């Protein structure tokens, strides 16, 4: 049954100066991973409940889509609207893909939901000084594009949509960037875990929230023959996807080195959080979210100790 009732957003999380007061700046990296991003949502909600603030977040794909609620300080919003609408045929799935060319509906998932049905708090988002950056992939060059979002308006929402537009099952999103019109797809193709980029931005403390457990290694994409045909007009994206497992695993190696050296604090799933591209069972989303909450609580003391060093 379709639910057309407008949803009144829950109160936002208060900013907590007692947790924020520290000498060094903090940058956080949020990996994507589709609905494994519910894990990230759980971690971030725990942080907000504790009143933790950081100076910058960079999100990729689902990390951008769900991480924006940290800047708007909306505890529980990401898991709430996904559980509410995951069974709605207007939200996502094969029917939406065949009708629109996008796995997730632009008009419903990126317009009706944030503007009317579970309202995104643009006032808090725009007034919060925390830097929020999303990563997209430039279809023409294959290079990552890093875009700071300030207002949370529909243009910002489209940048989030671009960051989460999975190749093959999404159309490129056209947006203006530095005076040029770009065609953009999922940032995970060009820079899946932008720890190196965040380190280059000058933040003294680095934190990464991953969506795969320790020891995970990405394997070559088995569907490359299909992907090559589907993306024959996007050769740079095809090249990225062909070598994505190698770049991703190299990033994991870099993360392990930074973590061992004490230069990076990593939160990763304590158990497997496998998730298909589309989940229609609200309980599956809740289960992944709860793993994130448990890990967020379990690591919170160590996180504060790292930030205080």
Model-identified regions with their sequence ranges:
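Patatin-like phospholipase
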Residues: 1-60, 68-309
């Amino acid at each position: 049954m379709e639910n057309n009732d407008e949803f009144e957003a829950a109160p936002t999380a208060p900013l907590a100066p007692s947790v924020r007061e520290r000498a060094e700046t903090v940058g956080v990296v949020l990996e994507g991973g589709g609905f494994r991003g519910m894990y990230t949502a759980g971690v971030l909600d725990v942080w907000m409940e504790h009143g933790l603030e950081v100076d910058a977040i960079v999100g990729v794909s689902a990390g951008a889509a769900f991480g924006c609620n940290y800047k708007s300080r909306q505890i529980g919003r990401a898991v709430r609207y996904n559980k509410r609408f995951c069974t709605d045929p207007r939200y996502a799935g094969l029917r939406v893909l065949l009708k629109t060319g996008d796995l997730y509906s632009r008009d419903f998932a990126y317009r009706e939901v944030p503007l009317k049905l579970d309202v995104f708090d643009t006032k808090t988002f725009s007034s919060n000084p925390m830097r929020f950056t999303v990563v997209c992939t430039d279809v023409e060059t294959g290079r990552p594009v890093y875009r700071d979002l300030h207002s949370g308006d529909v243009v910002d929402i489209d940048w989030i949509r671009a960051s989460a537009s999975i190749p093959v099952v999404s159309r490129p999103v056209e947006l203006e960037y530095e005076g040029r019109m770009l065609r953009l797809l999922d940032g995970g193709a060009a820079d899946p875990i932008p720890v190196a980029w965040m380190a280059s931005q000058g933040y003294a403390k680095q934190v990464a929230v991953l969506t795969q457990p320790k020891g995970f290694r990405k394997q070559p994409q088995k569907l490359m023959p299909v992907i090559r045909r589907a993306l024959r007009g996007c050769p740079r994206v095809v090249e990225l996807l062909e070598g994505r497992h190698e770049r991703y695993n190299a990033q994991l190696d870099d993360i392990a080195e930074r973590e061992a050296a004490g230069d990076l604090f990593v939160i990763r799933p304590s158990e497997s959080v496998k998730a298909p591209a589309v989940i229609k069972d609200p309980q599956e989303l809740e289960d992944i979210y709860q793993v994130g909450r448990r890990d967020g609580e379990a690591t919170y003391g160590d996180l504060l100790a790292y930030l205080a060093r």
